[in-house]
Every structure is written in structure tokens, then in C-alpha cells.
Amino acid sequence: MENRYPLLAGRRILRKESLWDIRDYAYGGWQLYYMDYTDGLLKGCAIKAQSGVLTIGKGMLKFHGFIYLMQEEERVPYRPADGWQSLKAEFTEDESSLDDKVYQGRFFLDNETGLKENQMEMCRFYLREGSVLRDSYKDFADMATEYDMLYLCNAAVAGIGEGRFHPGILKQFAKELGVQKGKEGADIALCYEIWNRDGEIQMALLRAWLEGKGISWGTDRMGKEEVFCCMEEVLRKGNVGGSRKRSEKVIYVE
């Protein structure tokens, strides 16, 4: 194993190989850190809706093993439509140049919620004529509202081995769970974990927390839909026990 670090001192010539080392170490570190993560949102990319424009903040996305760095905000105009609109990120690779390979990404709105092989979803919304699109939420249950709100439950968020919830969803959950009466030790521990990790929590931890409360969903492993539904019930009813039945519903659009 060998690692080379350029010595940036006066009167020394900076060779092109040294420049490559500087380039590769900075990017290679991120590649190693996120090597076990699925495709999806890694950092940032906060979405705001204002005056008919969606603004996607700076951040990092992973797609097909490559990490895309967004160093500038992106803007996408929107307007009401008779149905769901999906904000998608689309990725392409350009190898036409002999000097470099270009990894490109763009954001756009699509009336089709299905995804092509080179796309991922950032959020979706159903904006009615005469209504205002919201990007903030009254409470955790409000995040599953169908109309006139940025819906994050379907967002592609990178996780270890499987996708996870958008950090905004879990931070709202911890905010409400943290002030709930009759909290158990596991509830407090989960809140601290969410706060310390800024909402970046793996799905396995949420399932374990729910199972510790005696909440199950039959014999199948709980997916994001079921986990969200059970979390909402905990906030609505307090610390519930017993088994969870599939007959209960939540607004969760695939």
C-alpha cells in the first residue's frame, strides 16, 4: 500500500502526477465512505418551493456507484396539474471526449411517476389549481397529506444495503416523539440518534425500535410504507403494543 502526499513548498515544481493525487484523494475519500450505500440522496439537496419555482440546494447524489457533487443550486419551474408531478434527477455519461469522461445530471418535472433506468425521484406533489405548494409541515402526519405539499416519502435516499427515509421525515418524527408523555428509554435513545445523525438513520434501526414496542406487520419485513404507518400510529396513540394488521391504511403513493 502506498499513499503519496504532495509537498507544497516554495521553489518546488508541482508535477502533474501530484495534481492527480490531490484530485483523487479528495474524491476517493467520499467513494470509500459511501461504498456500501445504495443509490440516492447522500447529503443536502434541500428542496424549497416558492413563487412557482422549485429550488434544489447544494448536495451529493449517488447513482450507479458514482457520486455527483452539486456545487450550485438548481431551479425547476412548476405549475398546477391534474395529477401527481414527480421531481426527478436524470443521469447520463458522455465519453465523446478524448480528454475526459463527463458525468451529467439534470432535474426536471414529469407527470409520470414511473422511473427509467437512469432516473431517481427527489420528491413528488399534487398541486391543485389556485392552491399554494407547501414545503413545510404542520406535524408528522401532515407529511402524508396528498395535496399541495412536497411529498418526500418516495424520495430516493441512499442507505446501507437499502434506501432509507428522507432526513426531513425523521427529524420531524423525533421532534414530536421527544415531547410525548410516557416515553420509554428506547424512544429517548432513538430521538438522540436521529438528532445526532441529522436524520440519517438506517431502516433496520427503525424496524428494531418498532419491534421492541411489539409492533409487527405479519410475517413480511416492513417496508417504508409500513414503517411510516406504524411510526405515525405511535405518535397518534402513544406507546402501543400488540400486532399491526394490514387492514390499516396510509396515504403512500408508489
Give residue ranges: language-model regions.
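Beta-strand-rich solenoidal segments
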Residues: 4-8, 61-254
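N-terminal "first-domain core" detector
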Residues: 1-60
